[in-house]
Amino acid sequence: MSQQTTPAEQKSLQRKKPPFRADQVGSLLRSEPVKKARLQKAAGEMTAEQLRQIENDEIIRIVEKQKETGLNVVTDGEFRRAWWHFDFLENLDGVEPFTPEQGIQFHNVQTKARGIKVTGDIDFSTHPMLEDYSFLHSIAGDATPKMTIPSPNMLFFRGKLEKDEYKNDYQLFQHDVSKAYKKAIQAFYDRGCRYLQLDDTAWAVFLSEKGLKQIEAFGTTPDELRQLFAKSINDAIADRPDDLTVTMHICRGNFQSTWTAEGGYDAAAETIFDGLNLDGLFLEYDDSRSGGFEPLRYVKRSDLQLVLGLVTSKFGELENPDDVKRRIEEASRYVSLDQLCLSPQCGFASTEEGNKLTEEQQWAKLRHVVEIANDVWK
């Protein structure tokens, strides 16, 4: 790397707490046993208990596979979910699932139809994913288990507001959502969670002309929405325990190796990099759609970790490690190398369909991340 480090600084490059030098976003390709069991459950050929046992067995297997790649962090691959966001959001108080007329439009492909609507007061009383985390925690061993949930902004971005008080008062809606999330974060912490990630595609609306039209349809302005999104997150994570790491993954969409949005971080950079009280940010940087590293100049905090998603999860071909290292060096011109980490740009299966690569290619990608990180931060 271009920056010279002293022995003391070099020692600090070996991070003992998350996010780690080699990290991952979270979702993994659903295995064939899980896919088959889900179909059997839907057809009435399997009980919920039988499905959960198969999920348990497969999660145990993939946790070990993650460890074999050299990662210090493990997830359950989101194996119990169909969607990265809806499964969590529809189990909040005041939220219900529904079937819209069409799915979400991605680049040349559309998801199956699924939506959520806000019909009552938003709150958090309990949630099935608490048990999901407890199982992961029980099998993680020496690795750090990470829980991934959608950002509070996703309820605004993807939720159909049917409660009149919320439709007429976004500030009230934000207040109640953040309050519910604050309870959720504490509930996961009480189950032993010390590494929580918020996944967020809502920030992509600021990054393109298409997104700006969406903001106009919301009846607000970009400045107002940036402030609302930032307050939603900051209020939700305020006063969190000192030993809880909370990061956010900013995504431009990830469905069957396609995307929904493109554009650099410039239009929301000051808010993202200097307005959120998070411990780390997972940033997509796997191709030209994500722009350059110049927006990192807005980073003011020396304790904010930036996890560069320079390895794509959309395709199986491995990146040239020298190219990845060169890009890390480029990023280090704007922030200290000590503040940088490496991961895939997104999960491998944000929905149960998964991206277009094999499971072995997935593990190879994660090994690739670990090997490159070990070379850079050695």
UniProtKB/Swiss-Prot annotation:
Annotated signal peptide: none
In this chain, composition skew of type Polar residues spans 1-11
UniProt xrefs under Gene3D superfamilies: 3.20.20.210
Region of interest (Disordered), residue spans: 1-33
Enumerate the Gene Ontology biological process terms. methionine biosynthetic process
Q: Which domain of life is it from?
A: Bacteria
* Classification via CDD domains: CIMS_C_terminal_like
Question: Which Pfam families does the entry mention?
Answer: Meth_synt_2 (PF01717)
List the source organism: Bacillus subtilis (strain 168)
This protein's name: Uncharacterized protein YxjG
The record's family statement is: To B.subtilis YxjH.
Classification from the root reads: Bacteria, Bacillati, Bacillota, Bacilli, Bacillales
